[in-house]
């Protein structure tokens, strides 16, 4: 996808994580050929009670035993610069993530709805 290749030119590392089991991840990868090249990290094995990271980040949804759909943009100093968290039934927007990353990387004040590469304030 264009968003995936754009990330590679952004001096950024894109990782994905999941509390899904291996069977779910294989099915997801088969359904999304364009996203197979993204590095994927298994953050927690909910079957074994390994929840510390997703609990610390505040994205564990106990009724489902899974992490909510979250995106974190973290700078090189490990400071979270941007967070979005959605319920399990709402997907995320790769284009919006790239737009926010682009704005953060300008180091300047950016207007709402600024497009990637657009002018700063």
Which residues does each predicted region cover?
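Chalcogenol-based redox active-site neighborhoods
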Residues: 1-121
